[in-house]
Amino acid sequence: SSFTIYDTDDSLRVVKDCLKDLNIDEKQFPPRSVLGYISRAKDAMKLAEEYLADCERAGDFRLTKIAKVYVEYQRRLWEASALDFDDIILHTVRLLQQHEDVRAFYQRKFRYVLIDEYQDTNNLQYLLASTLAGGYENFCVVGDDDQSIYRFRGATIENILSFEEQYKGCRVIRLEENYRSTKHILEASNAVIRNNQGRKGKELWTKAGEGDKLT
């Protein structure tokens, strides 16, 4: 059957309506923040009723209220025959995990899987991509662990940091030559990022000149 895809604005509108009808104060529970919690729950593959049960079991009053919004939010999406962006991936992953014939069909269909900006992928995106690549295991990812800036949107740096462990036979190509910056800028950048212990490690260099000193 057909369905409608809700973008972020649509989802926010539904969350606001849910808060209003559940008599929950928007000032204490900002709609965008609530939507973020819902998105992270879906990224963890927690369906609404399951998430509510977990929050009630933990005795977390605030999260329980958010979970009740999640339940109502999903009910309204269902009534509208709508999916949000997270639902699209979540239901696809669940379909592939639960139906071996469907999984095998799409694993045969996609001989190569390539992902750019892999450091910005979340759990659901990882599960979808790795499942599709599970047939031929021709899985190529491009990313920079030093440029992971979207954790607030659910991105998990562990996806790229653990790639070599998950795919033992993979080949890692470090792209360390920089074409945009001067030597002084790269030296400063290398010195700063070197303090981050949670990275693969690389040393940027350039054929460009020294450039101006940093002030």
Language-model regions, residue ranges each:
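Conserved helicase NTPase motor core
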Residues: 58-162, 174-184
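Short hinge/gating elements
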Residues: 1-2, 20, 53-57, 73-78, ...
